[in-house]
Regions:
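Membrane-interface helix-loop junctions in multi-pass transport and translocation proteins
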Residues: 33-41, 145-149, 159-191, 360, ...
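N-terminal membrane topogenesis motif
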Residues: 1-25, 78-81, 85, 208-224, ...
Length: 481
């Protein structure tokens, strides 16, 4: 299999896994919103937000470090075994520490966010941490080895198990059952990863050196991820602080749909991180430039198409799935989409600085946007509520995008074809203006469908080169046959 075929295959498997996992996780949000209401959905989202935030710090970036060093030393069995051993043993210790921390601090979190119910939920969630930390490290091993088929299937199984466990428990135990479902799914996923992926015999040879190497690299990515997490989660946390759990539930629906369009760039990034690391180690700079250009452009087409869909049909989709209680999610969604589409263009290659060894830039670049995000949320949420939170997040994402592109051009000599992106955005903007002008004169669903077909056709004809279309057709023919 050629490098191109391998790349397309990996992206395909990862995209399908992400799509299926998202679809499997979607009913949980719908049931919580419809059956239990915005209050309990808000509690569940707060639990998930705290879970993701704490997980970011307790792993100390071990999964990202494992991806990088496994990709670089995949042909050196001895070094590979030492890296895996160092990562696994360290992850087990970190998992136990995180369990104790969350269990003891549960009441404190509940007091900070003025949600007494959080205490019991977090004590349940604490049992997931030892398994979740180890799971993250083992997924990093699969990514580093580019075992994307295994990665995809296990991700799907994890999401399916969470859905099944949640549905079995939620109707009798409410939101408590949903949190227990999280715990059970991570326990099962950890056991499955250990069974499926052959792990080298654990060795303490050079353990301290390898653990230090992993933590040294990983800790630098933690700050970056923490800053990005502020950009992703500060709005929900601050709505939880300034407003109510009901507002958290309503706003979380807008966030969920806004992040839905990141499914493709997120899938691509899982491949580009180890691939760019490998190219950099082999000094294949030309391949890096081509890869970045293609990934960003095709991510852009997908993101813009998805954004257009939600502008046309988002209000109907929210009302149909979640009911009238969540109709106020639509306007924050539109505001958020502006930031998510622009930031998503670079998201597919978001790990490029870590891949080429510019680790310090990984956290320095988003720092400005994180500061602006916090300040803007503090200022805007008390005045404009959910819309203020969405605006603060969008501005911070745009700032992060501008700074990242600037450094990519300056330090890695990545050339961005700005004219191409302007044409895509201008074309879609015209279609959106046409829709808004005539939606009250023509059936809005029919009009939206026609305009999306036109948009898709124009993208295919004018923004995908014949060379790339021929390659795609050739690869598709190979897989079909």
């Amino acid at each position: 299999m050629s490098d191109l075929q391998k790349f397309v295959s990996d992206v395909g498997f990862t995209f399908i896994a992400s799509a299926v996992s998202m679809l499997l996780g979607f009913p949980i949000t719908v049931v919580l919103g419809r059956y239990l209401g915005a209050d309990d959905l808000g509690l569940y989202r707060m639990v998930n937000t705290i879970f993701g935030t704490v997980m970011l710090f307790v792993t100390i970036g071990i999964p990202a470090a494992v991806i990088k060093y496994v990709a670089e030393f995949r042909d050196n069995d001895k070094k590979l075994g030492q890296i895996v051993s160092g990562g696994l043993i360290t992850s087990i210790l970190l998992g136990l520490i995180s369990f104790i921390f969350i269990y003891v601090s549960a009441s404190l979190f509940a007091a900070v966010f003025h949600m007494p119910e959080l205490s019991g939920l977090l004590k349940i969630l604490a049992f997931a941490f030892p398994f979740s930390v180890v799971t993250g490290m083992l997924f990093g091993l699969l990514n580093g080895l580019r075992e994307m088929t295994k990665n995809a299937w296990i991700s799907i199984i994890q999401s399916a198990s969470m859905l099944i466990f949640t549905f079995l428990l939620i109707f009798n135990y409410g939101v408590n059952g949903a949190v227990v479902g999280i715990v059970f799914s991570y326990v099962m996923t950890t056991l499955l990863l250990i069974f499926v992926q052959k792990i080298p015999n654990l060795t303490f040879s050079n353990f301290s050196d390898n653990a230090f190497q992993l933590i040294n690299f990983g800790s630098k990515t933690v700050l970056s991820n923490a800053i990005n997490l502020i950009n992703y989660q500060a709005d929900i946390l601050m709505i939880g602080y300034f407003m109510t759990k009901t507002d958290v539930g309503v706003y979380s629906v807008a966030v969920m749909f806004a992040k839905l369009i990141w499914i493709l760039p997120d899938s691509i990034q899982k491949i580009t991180f180890p691939l760019i690391s490998e190219y950099h180690a082999k000094e294949m700079n030309g391949s890096i430039h081509i890869l970045v250009d293609k990934c960003m452009k095709y991510s852009c087409l997908f993101l813009v198409f998805g954004t257009t869909f939600f502008i046309f049909f988002g209000n109907r989709v929210i009302s149909l799935i979640f009911g009238a209680e969540f109709e106020h999610s639509y306007f924050p969604l539109i505001i958020l989409l502006i930031g998510t589409v622009l930031y998503g263009i670079t998201k597919s290659v978001g790990s490029i600085f870590a891949s080429v060894g510019k680790v310090s830039l990984v956290y320095k670049i988003p720092l400005i946007s994180a500061i602006s995000n916090i300040v803007l949320n503090i200022v805007l949420i008390p005045i404009y509520g959910m819309n203020g939170a969405a605006l603060a997040t969008t501005i911070s994402l745009i700032v992060s995008t501008v700074v990242m592109i600037s450094f990519m051009k300056t330090l890695i000599n990545i050339r961005v074809d700005f004219i191409w992106y302007i044409k895509v955005l201008f074309l879609s903007g015209l279609l959106i203006c046409f829709f808004l002008s005539f939606k009250n004169l023509i059936n809005d669903i029919l009009l939206g469908v026609i305009l999306q077909i036109i948009e898709l056709t124009l993208f295919s004809v004018y923004f995908i080169s014949n060379h790339d279309k021929n390659k795609m057709f050739h690869l598709f023919s190979i897989y079909v046959n």
